[in-house]
Amino acid sequence: MGPNPMKMYPIEGNKSVQFIKPILEKLENVEVGEYSYYDSKNGETFDKQILYHYPILNDKLKIGKFCSIGPGVTIIMNGANHRMDGSTYPFNLFGNGWEKHMPKLDQLPIKGDTIIGNDVWIGKDVVIMPGVKIGDGAIVAANSVVVKDIAPYMLAGGNPANEIKQRFDQDTINQLLDIKWWNWPIDIINENIDKILDNSIIREVIWKK
């Protein structure tokens, strides 16, 4: 029961909605969970939305399970960063003698890994900047630019994106983070989808590892 998480296009006849694990798992320094999907604008695959991700920098992109990623979402990785201790112009890119001015890694503002949690909803045309961590269950409003971390189960939006409000009270959030339903075996998830959708899973112990 349920769709095959390794089938790129899980909806018959629909080439816009795509599970991203089979697309991204072949990329270096990328980890992605099952059932996370991208709703593309024009059929572009989600790997095209990850920019400036160069293996030499060794920064990782981690995306959890059951994430909903809207059209046009772009993830900017650390390779986009320029030196900022003087001129930001990348002279070395253009060769012809300028290549000798290649910056050292410790001269670049490397922000670390970019991490998107589980059950995260990212709206249309959101831009996620390098090194950001978006917590489990968070929602990011359309057209936002995420430049700093977003806490679990937080609604955030704007340019730059700010945390607007918690989706639930702190006790409920703590229970959801303890339950971690996205890590349940898929047969247990299948049996409890309605309870996952209305949050009644926090009122009973359904499954414990």
Curated annotation (Swiss-Prot):
Keywords: Acyltransferase, Antibiotic resistance, Repeat, Transferase. The keyword Acetylation does not apply. It holds the Pfam family Hexapep. It comes from the Bacteria. The keyword Cell cycle does not apply. GO terms for biological process: response to antibiotic. The active site is at 82. InterPro entries: Hexapep (IPR001451), Hexapep_transf_CS (IPR018357), Trans_hexapeptide_repeat (IPR050179), Trimer_LpxA-like_sf (IPR011004). SUPFAM superfamilies: Trimeric LpxA-like enzymes. Disulfide bonds: none annotated. GO terms for molecular function: acyltransferase activity. Its EC number is 2.3.1.-. PANTHER family: ACETYLTRANSFERASE, ACETYLTRANSFERASE RV3034C-RELATED. This is Streptogramin A acetyltransferase.
